[in-house]
Amino acid sequence: MRDFLSRKSPIALAITIAATGAVGSLTIAPNAQAQESLIEEVVVTARKRQESLQDVPVAVTALTPNQLERGSIQRTTDIDKMVPNVELHQTYIGSESLSASIRGIGFDDIEKSLEPTVGVAVDGVFMASNSGAVFDMFDVESVEVLRGPQGTLFGRNTIGGVINVTRTKPTGEWGLKLQATFGDQDMTDVKGVLNMPLGQNGGVKLAFKNIQSDSHVYNTTLNGRRDFRDSTTLSASIRYDFTENTSVIFTYDDYDHDTIAPDNLMVGPFPEPLTGYLASQNDDYKTSPQLNPLEAYMWGDNSTLQITHNAAGHQFKYTMGIMDYEEEVHESSWGSSTVFFPVNRDQDFKQTSHELQISSDSDGPLNYVAGFYYLEADSFITSGPIQPFTVNHEAEAQAFYGEMTYDFNDNWSVTLGARYTDEDKNMQTYSWPPVVGDPDRIANNLDPAVLQMAATPEFSDDNLTYRAVIQRNFSKGMVYASYSTGFRSGGFFNRGTSPAEVEPYDSEEVDSIEIGLRSNPTENTQLNLTYFNSEYTDMQLPLITPASFPECGKGGAEEDAAGITCSFIANVGETSMDGLEVEGIWMPTSTLTLRAALGTLDASYDSYDYAGRDIANVAQLLYAPELTWSVGAEHISQMFGGELILTANYSFQDEVFTQTPWAIYDPATFPKITIDDWESLDISATYLRDTENGTFKVILYGTDVLEDGNRVQRRYTTGSFTWAELAPRQQFGITIGYEF
């Protein structure tokens, strides 16, 4: 057992499981039982149309509802346990905000003026911000994780990849699904879905979910645990088929997320010694002395309308999405046992998007998809009393896109695609001198007489992204080679409090090559391989400087000593990276499924220009693990008149670097800048019993069962102080469900 849990043995096992499928067809004739154990076909929409996963020349991993439930994939942030070269976490300082990195290209901030590197789409609607991108996996039909730039079909801000989530649709029949989960930290998670018919040609679906829990961090100052989460979502969806060729689906979501973030740890150096951090470290990070809580609230509603019409061998689709929500964040301790650097942030956000799409469904050699996309996103934020500012940010983008695939014969095909995007942004930002003390004084400080800065920067850009693929099919699968480009929008840094800090920066671009194999060597094996090589230019990188730095202009040595800094976003970097991804499935029998995934990544800065000085030899890419892997097994047996399904998944992620002011980084004086490598064993036992009245379900689960306590999941620095966020490790629970 010790060898199995070592770092090298599981890697060898992952490769062995995948390779067994490839070699098996060459050396061993599968037995009759294995012949019947066909791997279920998975249909994906990675190219904006329904296709078999094994036919798509894109690096995509698809997770089914059963995999999500039995694999303890409870929220968006758990997906990385089963997908190679993906790193996901929740950013607690923003409500339900997703920190996502795919193939070493990540985004870990909360500002609406900054663009993510990994896109998240729900029911065909692209989320313009990472706020709200951490959500529950209940009532989900499929999850697709597309790795690598997806600039042609998904557009801007997908240079790392896309997480594409599709929820279930109204069935048009009577149906009910109820589920309750109880777990550690007094967690209760209650969910339900009701389906009902709407006349002869339609259906209505009503859904609700509420989760409440206490913090996984014990507070040594309060001698207890804080409340952690109280989140409620209500959804209503209506589907109506006006004809056999025309269908309309409308979905409305109302949500209210109240989060008291798990207490952080002050890492240093200001304002206190590392006493609390060291004590927590010695106790498996179970404790924190944080005096005041980090409160994050988010409430609002989403609307989605989709109209589909089929005619003359084509599908015409219109998708509209509206997200309208408010956020509040309050923090004044940052993991410390004292009060300092109080921050209160109130923010409004609204996005509206429209997409018109036409796709062909021809038996002939040519198939295509084309469309028009429009997005408008507006936000307004007020922040203080330290570094008080207000920002109004507006963004507008439109794009035309198209992609066609031509089959020369049964073996060879080529795909060509392009997307033209035009966008405009503007920002009105005002800042005032810091107000220390009573937060109500902020109102008195919003006086033009004491205005510190007023700026109205503007940004416009257009970009052409494209993709070319050549594909060769064979009896057991296919191979492909692709070249694709993508870009991440330029813009402004809205936390800036000086004119230099809010100057516009340009868009970031990527060129990527992929070579892939998709194969089913036998009827009970599947082996997928992908090699990628990417070059990123004009990278948008953060620069944190002392106040005395010439480009900052906020003061001299006295201001430096007070911890005053400047924060910039600038196009100062170039990066190259390559890696390999392996995914394999083997079904030795009809009741046993083995899975494995492996991701390698070699990524480094080619250049990182800091005021004429190249710091590429010092700086490291954030959240870019060199190695990720997982192995899993699922066994199904008949027991007590029902099915018993045993599932286990063991995953590993290498160490990663965190946000650090690399230009002034000194290993002798700076706090630790890495997150240690970590592994997790998740297990579950699911019992299903079908009766004439429906299906009853009981799930016993454990996540990260081999490790007690918590672990550091993120480290953040402002230039003057650093704090760490803690993620839970070992958790146990039970789920009870019923559906018909």
Regions found by a protein language model. Name each.
Residues L5, T16, N195, Q347-G371, ...:
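Conserved C-terminal beta-signal and adjacent last beta-strands/turns
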Residues Q35-E173, I515:
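Acidic, small-polar-rich N-terminal luminal/periplasmic segments of exported/outer-membrane proteins
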Residues E115-T117, S129, F138-R147, T152-N219, ...:
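Outer-membrane beta-barrel translocator/receptor signature
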Residues N223, R229-Y368, E376, Q526-N528:
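Outer-membrane beta-barrel domain signature, strongest for Gram-negative TonB-dependent receptors
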Residues R239-T243, I358-D361, P365, Y373-L375, ...:
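Structural signature of Gram-negative outer-membrane beta-barrels, strongest in the C-terminal barrel
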Residues D256-P269, E376-S383, D438, I442-V450, ...:
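Surface-exposed extracellular loop regions of Gram-negative outer-membrane beta-barrel proteins
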Residues V339-S360, A397-Y401, V502-D506, S512, ...:
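Outer membrane beta-barrel strand-and-loop segments of large Gram-negative receptors
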Residues N367-G371, D410-V414, N533-E535, I564-P661, ...:
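Gram-negative outer-membrane beta-barrel transporters
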